[in-house]
């Protein structure tokens, strides 16, 4: 055990109506913040965290361990407001490749040269299929043409790495679901699919990710179901395993989707349960399954997304809380325990992606491109003829290739295709 979307709700695959909501306003100018103070503050936080690496929400023996202090930031000098403190520049990112997919396709890029595809049906008489897109060649291949559980089940979600292909099938009539995985080699399935988890209407369909030879997922009770008081689990299955094993337990639901970036898993279990509702955004090295960093959110503040990139968390809050200080505000934050934090005051819609000091943050119809080292930001606009909600990130966390997708109109003004774009970072 670790030391501490159809259904893509937490993926923020929102429709056009949901994305017409107004952006949050900026916050006041933050005095006293310079690049040097930000770097020095981050270094101090790194040293403090290194001393406390044994702090986590789960233990090897499952026992409760002491967590870090909730981060109630009231000193605004510890916050760098992107739109006020950084310089606005023209975006220099260039499209390295672009492909048009059939209308309704949704790509998911976990890592490497492959993106899993939820493919739209070819006609009203056929069902969705699952496929894969080579980001090196643009070749699209159908891998699974019908649900393994029979005609009453439909494809619900899909992910892949270079070595494993995983998907959820669900019966919308009963709420039953299964999580399956199958080895993948050079974009082709190997062997037979293996059912690695399942649930009924009391359990939310697995939130999952793929990395290397592993599938990692969260099994949680529905917040309003009869099992809502049950413990949630984060599990791992590797190609060749007979059974999955539990990595972490949470007394209550995890707050965020499991995200994997450069071999580091980020999850947000409940912590400090005797003191109230607290979420600990926690990063684990998957090679050792040891905690490398943790940030405890203010009481009752639930993170919307979180991923560990470099030596900082990139996380977001989707509502304005009446308490909690700065971290109780709606927006996206980059930082770690003790601060300082880079803050973008915009409604969060998806997981952050990027490389090094460059972060791409989805905001309404475009992406903010934030460079914390250069102290600049720019706007990556959606492709021509994109629908009003613009493009969404298919990638997550640290990546050499940022992948986005958008529904674009044809010459007649109607939605015609899904345009996938890749940007070298």
Question: What are these model-derived regions, one by one?
Answer:
Residues 111-120, 163-170, 213-222, 263-274, ...:
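Short beta-strand elements that form the blades of beta-propeller/WD-repeat-like
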Residues 101-110, 150-159, 200-209, 251-261, ...:
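Repeated scaffold domains used in trafficking and secretory/extracellular systems
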Residues 32-40, 47-66:
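N-terminal twin-arginine translocation
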């Amino acid at each position: 055990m670790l030391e501490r979307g159809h259904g893509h709700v937490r993926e923020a695959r929102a429709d056009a109506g949901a994305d017409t909501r107004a952006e949050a306003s900026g916050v006041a100018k933050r005095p006293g913040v310079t690049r040097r103070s930000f770097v020095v503050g981050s270094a101090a936080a790194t040293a403090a965290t290194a001393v406390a690496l044994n702090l986590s929400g789960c233990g090897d023996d499952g026992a409760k361990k002491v967590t870090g202090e909730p981060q109630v930031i009231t000193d605004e000098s510890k916050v760098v407001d992107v739109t006020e403190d950084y310089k606005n520049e023209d975006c220099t990112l260039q499209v390295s490749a672009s492909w048009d997919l059939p209308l309704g396709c949704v790509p998911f890029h976990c890592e490497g040269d492959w993106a899993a595809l939820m493919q739209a049906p070819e006609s009203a008489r056929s069902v969705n299929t699952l496929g894969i897109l080579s980001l090196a060649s643009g070749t699209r291949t159908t891998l699974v043409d019908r649900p393994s559980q029979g005609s009453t089940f439909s494809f619900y979600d899909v992910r892949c790495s270079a070595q494993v292909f995983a998907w959820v099938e669900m019966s919308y009539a009963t709420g039953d679901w299964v999580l399956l995985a199958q080895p993948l080699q050079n974009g082709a399935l190997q062997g037979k699919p293996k059912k690695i988890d399942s649930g009924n209407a009391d359990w939310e369909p697995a939130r999952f990710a793929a990395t290397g030879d592993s599938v990692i997922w969260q099994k949680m009770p529905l917040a309003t179901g009869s099992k809502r008081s049950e413990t949630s689990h984060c599990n791992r299955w590797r190609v060749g395993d007979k059974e999955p094993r539990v990595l972490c337990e949470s007394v209550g639901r995890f707050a965020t989707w499991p995200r994997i970036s450069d071999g580091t898993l980020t999850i947000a279990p409940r912590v400090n349960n005797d003191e109230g509702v607290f979420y600990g955004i926690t990063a684990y090295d998957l090679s050792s399954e040891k905690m490398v960093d943790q940030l405890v959110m203010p009481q009752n503040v639930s993170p919307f997304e979180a991923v560990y990139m470099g030596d900082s968390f990139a996380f977001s809050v989707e509502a304005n809380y009446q308490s909690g200080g700065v971290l109780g505000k709606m927006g996206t934050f980059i930082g770690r325990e003790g601060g300082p934090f880079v803050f973008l005051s915009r409604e969060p819609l998806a997981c952050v992606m990027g490389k090094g000091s460059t972060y791409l943050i989805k905001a309404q119809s475009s992406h903010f491109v934030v460079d914390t080292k250069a102290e600049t930001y720019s706007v990556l606009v959606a492709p021509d003829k994109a629908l009003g909600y613009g493009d969404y990130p298919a990638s997550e966390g640290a990546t050499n290739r940022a992948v986005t997708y958008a529904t674009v109109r044809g010459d007649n003004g109607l939605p015609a295709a899904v345009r996938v774009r890749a940007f070298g970072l």
